[in-house]
Amino acid sequence: MPLSDFILALKDNPYFGAGFGLVGVGTALALARKGVQLGLVAFRRHYMITLEVPARDRSYAWLLSWLTRHSTRTQHLSVETSYLQHESGRISTKFEFVPSPGNHFIWYRGKWIRVERSREMQMIDLQTGTPWESVTFTALGTDRKVFFNILEEARELALQQEEGKTVMYTAVGSEWRPFGYPRRRRPLNSVVLQQGLADRIVRDVQEFIDNPKWYTDRGIPYRRGYLLYGPPGCGKSSFITALAGELEHSICLLSLTDSSLSDDRLNHLLSVAPQQSLVLLEDVDAAFLSRDLAVENPVKYQGLGRLTFSGLLNALDGVASTEARIVFMTTNHVDRLDPALIRPGRVDLKEYVGYCSHWQLTQMFQRFYPGQAPSLAENFAEHVLRATNQISPAQVQGYFMLYKNDPVGAIHNAESLRR
């Protein structure tokens, strides 16, 4: 059969015509679908703006609080339950609703914004064991200012929640995370130290904060170390907490006895400490002993974890140590500390915080019983010092709690403080 006759036969065949038509329709639909997909990709690329915030970013918690404030009509929610312990010891429960994982739409300054909160169940945070999360904002247009405004509002909202409070951070893995809720700032005058001691420390810290250029011009590392030593209960940690509130700084709590703390991790934590924060190393004598005592017990000298003594020294004042940092260390036994740890450059100011003096006792009495005659405070101090000359502010405060509204009774029974 000639080729022309074969083509004419196919043309007259109804089955072939129908099949060819179906192929044509299918091809057209596939091309249209591909065109729509390419069009959507081009539209998203050129006419939409997207912002992704991973859970590790510091603004992630801010944005969740911001979403809670702005997505009041969202019907798909997750709950975050937390416990708050008051100074009286009473514990209250707080519930906070946040948008659940999924897609949400909010109206913000004349724009619809799509918010996608995603949770990867196959990926977890090895430090906390929680699934990996992220939140993605999508808006029409190409102006990034809308996202800057959202981040700025979220930051301001977080600052309002922390206003007048001190934020505590603790080390979790390789980063600092807030520890509990921000605490109400403790007034500096609520911690009564020996006369002039608090003013001397505050003046030194403030001078350091206000003069970074002085250190730079002279080639001196811009960091400052403090050591407060003395008997337990004399106000070392309490003063540091009050000082942070006075300076509007946060506190980074770091335990040197943490078994997971290594040299590299310590150096990293000190380098990524939040700005405007005080790094607090409490009871440093419990982690390391003097090298003179290490001969008898070398294992104890090397600490309870993977942190080495040389690693601590290098983190505080080594080639890789960071600047713009304030470190406070406390100890009850300064004689147990190695001289290399407390030399200038690592510890620039050492202050003894000891038992109550006559002046401290009078100040504490007047603060606890305002409006009483100064002679009563003098009388109380004399009675206490006759009973004992080694009494800590914590003991005096505990004693006052027994006579909340009875200053005369506190004076008459001061002999009970005798050891």
From Swiss-Prot:
Tell me the impact of changing residue 35 to R: In BJS; with mild mitochondrial complex III deficiency
Quaternary organization: Interacts with LETM1.
Summary of the tissues where the protein is detected? Ubiquitous.
Keyword Protein transport tagged: no
- Which organism was this protein described from? Homo sapiens
Pfam families per record: AAA, AAA_lid_BCS1, BCS1_N
Q: Which gene encodes it?
A: BCS1L
This protein's name: Mitochondrial chaperone BCS1
List Phosphotyrosine occurrences by residue: 181
Q: What class of enzyme is it?
A: hydrolase
Kindly indicate where the leader peptide sits in this chain: none
Which keywords has UniProt assigned to this entry? ATP-binding, Chaperone, Deafness, Disease variant, Hydrolase, Membrane, Mitochondrion, Mitochondrion inner membrane, Nucleotide-binding, Phosphoprotein, Primary mitochondrial disease, Transmembrane, Transmembrane helix
